Design a protein with these regions (language model features):
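Non-catalytic linker/capping segments at the edges of enzyme domains
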Residues: 1-36, 61, 75-78, 91-97, ...
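Generic low-polarity alpha-helical segments
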Residues: 12-16, 46, 69-71
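Short, well-structured hydrophobic secondary-structure segments
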Residues: 23, 34-57, 193, 197-206
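Hydrophobic pocket/interface hotspot
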Residues: 46, 88, 171
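Hydrophobic beta-strand-centered segment that forms part of the acyl-chain substrate-binding groove
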Residues: 50-87, 112, 118-120, 202-242, ...
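Phosphate-/nucleic-acid-contacting segments
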Residues: 103
Length: 277
């Protein structure tokens, strides 16, 4: 990849409808050559569209960061070669924070829905060039960006130290010291993406759930709530991950996901899983 900026972790190719400070519609063509495009990255695409509306609304003085998503519903899968149809509606936006709802579809079929998301604003110049972002938004709203530049994020090892099928696990994640996505997220201040961490934790939660006799191999994630990022995760940081799966009630099990550095909690979420019908 010649230049990972706006490529290695950017999931909006075109903005087809834009109402300043209010709403937007856009698209992202998932490259057919990537191995997969998991639900957490679909949620990232929706959040990035909201970020474009938010940054434009305050003249690129700030940018929202992933901090709190009250509810995300997983309604279907997006596959390599699919085109995501993205939509966001802004409830409130100022220099302090943006609040929004959004969803993504494939071929008119809803695959994800985000409700009551809140992203606090931080100075945009700490993370990226305001001028480069303005130019990028103009491109997205005009002819769109070249598709197919996303090459995947590569393998990030999750080292499982303890696994109790159907109950829980403990694992460690060593955040890479360098990776192409750091040049995109973000050029001036590399941050490990919250949605990438969520994807890694969701995958391990599925490993636990598939060991439950009540869920089995067909277990799938249907909803995540109370996603909270408490601090940035930086290159070379070690994360201790805990997954705790509760009892199955009416066909649904709830898992608590958390990541710590030392004794400090940096991320948490609640994941609901059920057996595929």
């Amino acid at each position: 990849m010649s230049d990972p900026h706006f490529a290695a972790y950017s999931f909006v190719d075109r903005i087809t409808e834009f109402h300043a400070g209010k709403r937007a519609r856009g698209a992202f063509a998932i490259p057919p050559h990537v191995a997969a495009f998991p639900p957490a990255l679909v949620a990232e695409a929706v959040g990035q569209l909201a970020a474009w509306v938010a940054m434009d609304a305050i003249d690129f003085r700030g940018r929202p960061v992933a901090a709190l998503a009250t509810e995300t519903r997983f309604e279907g899968d997006a596959k390599p070669g699919d085109t995501l149809e993205l939509a966001v509606d802004i409830e409130q936006c100022d220099d302090e924070a943006v609040a929004y709802d959004g969803h993504a579809s494939v071929g008119g079929r809803r695959v994800i829905e985000l409700a009551d998301c809140l992203g606090p604003m931080l100075p945009v110049a700490d993370f990226d060039s305001p001028d480069a972002l303005r130019e990028r938004l103009s491109l997205l709203r005009a002819e769109g960006a070249p598709a197919g530049r996303f090459a995947g994020v590569g393998d990030i090892a999750v080292n499982v130290n303890r696994l109790t099928p159907g109950s829980g696990l403990h694992a460690t994640i060593d955040v890479p010291s360098a990776a192409p996505f750091f040049a995109d997220h973000f050029p001036r201040r590399p941050v490990f993406p919250a949605t990438l961490l969520l994807d890694l934790m969701m995958r391990r939660a599925l490993d636990v759930a598939r060991g439950s006799p009540a869920l089995g191999e067909s277990a799938r994630a249907v909803r995540v709530t109370h996603v909270k990022m408490r601090s940035f995760i930086v290159p070379s940081q070690r994360l201790d991950v805990e997954i705790a799966l509760g009892a199955v009630d009416d066909g649904v099990a709830k898992a608590m996901l958390s990541a710590k550095t030392g004794e400090r909690l940096v991320a948490s979420a609640r994941l609901e899983l059920m057996a595929e019908a």
